[in-house]
């Protein structure tokens, strides 16, 4: 079966614990990550090492691109301009840093050079913006999914660059002109719970649902800031509509509350 996992953000121990739980119950599990492997969390280096070793375009572990990976790709162009012109660190021309902490991680890992950065830049640049997947559910129905980091725009004629930006950054959850079910991350359900304007089935710190929309970003990296909420790393099974999490299993509850057929 196929499982979509939310934003990792350097939470290596949570990621490994969740993968172990899923794979102990389903040895043939196929895993799709929604991007944002980096920044904020305690073990970005370990997450990156694991990702480069295991994630491929069509293998057991797959992924789409997150906005944090995209921001690094944009920063890399500035870094290379600086490197080609300055050649080394200079007080007059300080090295450009990433908006978040990726460049500091690279520096700490001894990778802050064109050669050192290349494997990570290659990995990020080959992550697709979205994936379409069709599965047969446990009840025998065929369901089309769109796996994306943030949102998918179904209006015809949308320019590619606009679609890519939407895939990475937009927050229009549930407004889809398609029968596909969009599974995404990007906005932690903790944050969505604070937005009174959003008519959204919010379960703070857990996977949340709207019409044709599943948000798997439970905000794992923020769990210390929100001790009153579960705030865990979660996974959604495309075939059974069940959830998996490292700390608790709530699949039966969610299966009874949400289905693409109502």
Please give the residue ranges for each predicted region:
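N-terminal active-site segment of His-dependent metallophosphoesterases
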Residues: 1-50, 54
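Active-site neighborhood of phospho(di)ester-bond hydrolases with catalytic His/Asp-centered motifs
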Residues: 5-6, 31-35, 62-67, 148, ...
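Active-site environment of divalent metal-dependent phosphoester hydrolases
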Residues: 9-13, 39-42, 68-73, 155, ...
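Active-site neighborhood of divalent metal-dependent phosphoester bond hydrolases
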Residues: 40-132
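Acidic, His/Gly-enriched loop-helix segments that form or flank divalent-metal centers
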Residues: 92-215, 219-226
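Binuclear metal-dependent phosphoesterase catalytic core
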Residues: 209-249
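Positively charged, low-complexity/disordered segments
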Residues: 251-262
């Amino acid at each position: 079966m196929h499982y979509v996992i939310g934003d990792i953000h350097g939470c290596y121990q949570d990621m490994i614990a969740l993968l172990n739980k899923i794979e102990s119950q389903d040895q043939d599990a196929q895993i799709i990550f929604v991007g944002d492997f980096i920044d904020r969390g305690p073990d970005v280096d370990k997450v990156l090492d694991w990702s480069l070793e295991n994630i491929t375009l069509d293998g057991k572990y797959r992924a789409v691109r997150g906005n944090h990976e995209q921001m690094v790709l944009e920063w890399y162009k500035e870094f290379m301009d600086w490197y080609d012109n300055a050649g080394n660190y200079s007080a007059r021309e300080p090295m450009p840093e990433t908006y978040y902490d990726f460049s500091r991680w690279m520096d700490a890992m001894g990778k802050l050079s064109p050669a050192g950065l290349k494997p990570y830049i290659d990995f990020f640049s080959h992550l697709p913006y979205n994936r379409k997947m069709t599965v047969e559910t446990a009840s025998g129905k065929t369901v089309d999914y769109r796996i994306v980091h943030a949102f998918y725009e179904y209006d015809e004629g949308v320019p590619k660059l606009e679609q890519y930006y939407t895939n990475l950054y937009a927050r229009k959850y549930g407004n889809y002109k398609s029968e596909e079910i969009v599974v995404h991350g990007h906005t932690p359900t903790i944050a969505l719970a604070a937005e009174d304007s959003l008519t959204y089935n919010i379960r703070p710190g857990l996977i949340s649902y709207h019409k044709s929309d599943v948000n798997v970003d439970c905000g794992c990296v923020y769990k210390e800031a929100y001790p009153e909420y579960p705030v865990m790393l979660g996974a959604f099974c495309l075939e059974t509509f069940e959830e998996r999490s490292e700390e608790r299993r709530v699949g039966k509850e969610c299966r009874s509350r949400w289905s693409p057929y109502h």
